[in-house]
Amino acid sequence: MINRDLIRRKIVQLTYAYYQNGNHNMDNAEKELLFSLSKAYDLYNYMLQLIVAVTKEARKRYDVELARAQREGAEAPSQKFAFNRFAVQLEENKMLGDWIDAKHSSWDDDIEFVRKLYTNITASEVFQEYMASEEDNYEADREAWRKFYKNFVMSNEELDALLEEKSLYWNDDKEVVDTFVLKTIKRFEQENKADQELLPEYKDLEDRDFARKLFRSTILNCDQYQRYMSDASRNWDFSRLLTWMWLSCRLPLQRW
């Protein structure tokens, strides 16, 4: 999941922080980079877990409605959303389960947000279309959750604020993580059952080494890059350039 574009983005942010905080400890800065990247992967799993949390809430509502229908002799409610095939498969996914166990992760502390998200989804036109559709199969269930995620999880200001409170590392990561979640939903296949592979933290170990080497090279060769910038822009008024803009110009020199 952690690709080279995300790595470069993180390096720009952390190189800026490296020079701003004045504590030029390369080893600590490198550890911070790798930790920041690992937090992006945590967010990816946490967003997948949100789908499971909403599904569990739907199942609780279904159980209440079913019990009421049985008492009153009424027609049983639809279980289409509560037992959405894709969401059930995700709930049983071994890789996600291992991550949840390792991180002791849960949405229980934010159940009110989960309930609000459930309400927003079930009150929507896209939900009504899903429930009314005669297409009742795995592919339709998977596509429904792709739409729910795109419409109600992406660009969700309340969720953004909630995530920022949980980790400052997630403040700038959600937009790119959302694309990986949508990619993951699209890749799910029913026949893979609980063994469906999620995106790995790194596509290969070379990407982790790439992050370390690029970061070190950017820091260690800073003075040389500064001379390059000065020679290439003699007529610029550097006193009016923002540090962030200047830093962003340096990193492309290190594109490998």
Q: Model regions: which residues?
A:
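Class I Rossmann-like S-adenosyl-L-methionine
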Residues: M1-W256
